[in-house]
């Protein structure tokens, strides 16, 4: 087996496109559709593979920024501190695996949820506004990441994912 993931994906896409597709019953529309979706998904994965680490880091940075804003503007701290420290450490560790970055981001989102449940109810509107504003970057990055899937109604309005993960914080 070839160890290069890009080459492996190319080989699988070629095999599915040239060999498997000819064996799929042309009258089986569902099978034909699923094969084409699978090939397209693999192609999308192949194009995104080199950017995966930057993408995960950008989402983790977005979560960290959101948590810091919540802590600062709600005046309540404590519930976010450890998860924020974990994400900060993940973002400074050059050897950390993508999965660990994503896990630390997920734990921070859980801590954000817990924080929101515990804040004073009078801060609800402030917290809502912080979350909405703080989520825009991640939403835009995720839309750009998946734009090639073909489900985005306004794909031409979505910036290229490479542009959205090229900031110094996400290198």
Language-model region placement:
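Surface-exposed polar/charged interaction patches
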Residues: 19-22, 26, 48, 70-76, ...
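Glycine-rich, aromatic-bearing surface loops/beta-hairpins
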Residues: 123-171
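Structured domain cores in non-transmembrane regions
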Residues: 54, 64-89
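Acidic, low-complexity proline/glycine-rich segments
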Residues: 1-13
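Amphipathic protein-protein interaction modules
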Residues: 80-143
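N-terminal interaction modules that seed assembly of large macromolecular complexes
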Residues: 10-71
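Non-membrane alpha-helical secondary structure
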Residues: 1, 37, 55-62, 76-79, ...
């Amino acid at each position: 087996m070839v160890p290069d993931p890009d080459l492996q994906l190319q080989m699988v896409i070629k095999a599915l496109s040239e060999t498997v597709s000819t064996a799929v019953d042309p009258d089986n529309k569902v099978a034909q559709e699923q094969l084409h979706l699978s090939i397209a998904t693999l192609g999308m994965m192949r194009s995104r593979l080199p950017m995966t680490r930057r993408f995960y880091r950008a989402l983790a940075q977005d979560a960290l920024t959101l948590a810091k804003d919540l802590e600062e503007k709600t005046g309540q701290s404590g519930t976010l501190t450890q998860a924020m420290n974990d994400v900060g450490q993940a973002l400074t560790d050059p050897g950390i695996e993508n999965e660990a970055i994503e896990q630390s981001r997920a734990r921070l989102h859980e801590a954000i949820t817990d924080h929101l449940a515990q804040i004073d109810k009078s801060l609800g509107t402030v917290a809502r506004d912080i979350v909405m504003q703080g989520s825009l970057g991640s939403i835009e990055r995720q839309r750009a990441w998946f734009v090639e899937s073909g489900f985005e109604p306004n794909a031409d309005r979505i910036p290229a994912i490479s542009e959205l993960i090229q900031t110094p914080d996400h290198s």
